[in-house]
Amino acid sequence: MSELITAANIDSVIKKNNEIRNEVSGQTMKLQMNPAIMKVASRPQLALLILQGFGLIQMPIEDKFWSGAIFVKNGKIIPVLNTALPRANQYFTAWHEIYHIIFDKVSFDHFIERDNTIEERKAECFAASMLLADVDRYFIELPEMDFVSKIFLCMSVFQAPYKAVFLSLYEYAIRSENETLAKRIKEVFDVEFEDMPQRFQELGLDDSLVKPSYVVNASSLQERIRRSEVTNPELNYHKDNEEFLKNIMKEIFMITRKGE
């Protein structure tokens, strides 16, 4: 699980990002140059499309700190997204999990906490690279308006969550030595806007981005199971699809402490 970022620890997070930036930038470029992967222009929809190929499960889990995970069952990687979170968070989490699937060589085969923590930070940087490229340029070119309204506009255009936008802009502020912007970001970084959908509406923005989708969908996994049965009819561990899915759901609820 990714660390909770606050105004108090944002500088240490930026320091970690700087240490891994070149590696993550190379990984981002490698993916973006692959025509077999970059099939659609919409980055959020592309992320979901990629995960569907791995048997994506989408389901609402009432835990705001649990955005998603990768489960390994019978040697197969299965991504899960929490649809009880706003769509913007789901899109960011999707790219986070794609990093783990494609580039993470640590988290699935050993449990060295320091290495896993670094991989989580790399996954966050990768997601930001895929969704928030040039957000700083867009931000500084916006006309004069309330500071938070500018952040909401960035969220809408880049389809990214509130704190991810702030973190990218804070990195820009530090690089450009813009102390005024850095200070302003810290002042509002920890503010939680319960009325964010209403604020989006007032700005003429689509508020569905900041609302949960509550999608329940395991069809990608079911199709993957079906293909496995056709390809390997001699194997029997996929025979009972319902039991297979139920076991995964049980693990999810155990991890989120919502079930036994």
Model-derived features with residue positions:
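Active-site hotspot residues in diverse enzymes, especially metal/ion-binding acidic/histidine motifs
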Residues: 1-260
